[in-house]
Amino acid sequence: WFRSFKSYYGHHGSVYRPNEPNFRSFAS
């Protein structure tokens, strides 16, 4: 699911940008 989510995140990066630090922490 990570690839699909990452792709979605990439397309909507501007929308989730505020959560980017959290996303990276979660990814780690």
Swiss-Prot record:
Localization = Secreted
Tell me if Signal is a UniProt keyword of this record: no
Single GO molecular function: acetylcholine receptor inhibitor activity
Q: Tissue expression, per UniProt?
A: Expressed by the venom duct.
Q: What GO CC annotations are associated with the protein?
A: extracellular region; host cell postsynaptic membrane
Per the record's keyword annotation, is Secreted included, yes or no? yes
Q: Which UniProt keywords apply?
A: Acetylcholine receptor inhibiting toxin, Neurotoxin, Postsynaptic neurotoxin, Secreted, Toxin
- Function per UniProt: Potent inhibitor of human alpha-3-beta-2 nAChRs (IC(50)=566.2 nM). Irreversibly inhibits the acetylcholine-induced response on human alpha-7/CHRNA7 (55% inhibition at 5.6 uM) and alpha-3-beta-2/CHRNA3-CHRNB2 (91% inhibition) nAChRs.
Q: What else is known?
A: According to molecular mass, may be composed of about 112 residues.
- Quote the protein name from its UniProt record: Turritoxin F21-2
The protein's organism comes out as: Polystira nobilis (Sea snail)
